Amino acid sequence: MGVAQCHAQKSGSGLRHWEIASADPDRMFLTFHGDPASGRAITWRTAGDTKTLAYAEIAKASGNSTFAREAIRIEAKTEMLDLNVSKRNKQGTVNYHSAIFKDLDPDTLYAYRVGDGGKRWSEWIQFRTASREAKPFKFVFFGDAQNGILTHWSRTIRMAYQTAPDASFALHAGDLINKSHVDNEWAEWFKAGSFLHSQWTGVPVVGNHEYIGDTKAIKKDLSIQWRPQFTLPVDEDLPEELHETVYTVAYQGMQLILLNSNKLIAEQKPYLESQLKKPGFRWRVVAFHHSVFSPRRGISETSMAIEKRWRPLFEKYNVDMVLQGHDHAYTRGQVPIRGKAEFVKNTFQTMYVTSVSGPKQYPLNPKHMKTFGPRGLETIRNGEHTQFFQVIGADGDKLNYRAYATTGELYDEATITKNFKTGKKKITQEIPDVKERVFPSKSGDKKGKK
């Protein structure tokens, strides 16, 4: 969480009731903090003129309401956020509160709530801590939400919940909104996800639209809401401007590394390698916003920087999966093992996925996708003009990947099987009998802003 100065309070005139901060907690967002087996962080919002202290309470959940008698109360940290940096915002200052849950028992169901310590509390919400063993688990993945968030992205995240209600966490690959500082867009994002943002542990990745302000904003800087509303891990070895945008989660045998592909790509390389060097993980997954293999833009300055700085480490440390967004289309491909002079045929090392979960869509560009082969990527499955979400599950020596359309239709599937002693892998394609959603008449080299 960051600190912001406050100015005169605006009235909130013209806003919908669920956009306006009040004395009641809203915009609750659960994140990892420290070891997922023993810690979490929760962040929420109240009105800027709310003067009372803020608290979180937590207890081991039970089948009846008596668990609440055993709840431990934690005083929250509070900061005021000035929304006046954008003249499109119709509220002045709001409060953001954060509390850290520590020393929890592993693989245990907990219930928590947040409030003022008096009459204004949230409902009790449950989550389960991670196991210290490599037990099977799954998580959901979302490419860009960005536009039409409440009207259209809401059905994607809700269908994901119907499909995988027991998911351990939700990974958002950037461009959660369109205009970084505009608060009504964040209001839509929180309303679209509703209780899921406080029940699923969230893993947000920063995208370029978290850096794009509106025309009246003072700066095109990181969204003023990002750090106040997401309490994320901080690595002091990283430059301060990367704090809470670059971090790592270790979950039940999986190492999940979240990077910031918007800036300081070279500066993140030492951090990335320091994390990948850590032993003891069965699976390694890396996520960031911009695509290495862009099905829309082809080779860009950003993709070249990632390919030069990060991709060699993906190969050196045998990364299993790379998850990305940005291109508003779908493609899944795979890269073989690189030999001394060339790629080794009939081998598999890393799966690359680019996806989109919101309604903004771009056509695939066959011209740019022709650059994939010489760079080592074999494209397996493509899609366009479709909203997707993914369910990814680790179980023993298998890492299963499934892509669903927002209707719930299974669109793509593959399973990686790994020998943990040798690191050698094979991939099994399990693509369902569903026609590939590619529309040649709509594809081409049309230019469009991200």
Language model region names:
Residues 37-41, 50-55, 64-67, 148-151, ...:
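Short, solvent-exposed loop/turn elements at domain surfaces
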Residues 51, 95-101, 109-126, 184-280, ...:
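Extended active-site neighborhood of metal-dependent phosphoesterases/phosphodiesterases
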Residues 142-148, 173-185, 214, 255-264, ...:
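The substrate-binding groove and active-site-proximal loops of carbohydrate-active enzymes
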Residues 2-141, 162-163, 385, 391-450:
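Acidic, histidine-bearing metal-coordination/catalytic regions of metal-dependent phosphoesterases
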Residues 49, 145-148, 176-179, 208-212, ...:
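Solvent-exposed loop/turn segments at secondary-structure junctions
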Residues 279-322, 342, 371-373, 438-439:
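Active-site-proximal segments of metal-dependent phosphoesterases and phosphodiesterases across multiple
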Residues 135-205, 210-211:
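Conserved, compact domain cores that house catalytic/ligand-binding motifs in diverse enzymes
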Residues 141-143, 169-175, 201-208, 259-260, ...:
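Active-site neighborhood of phospho(di)ester-bond hydrolases with catalytic His/Asp-centered motifs
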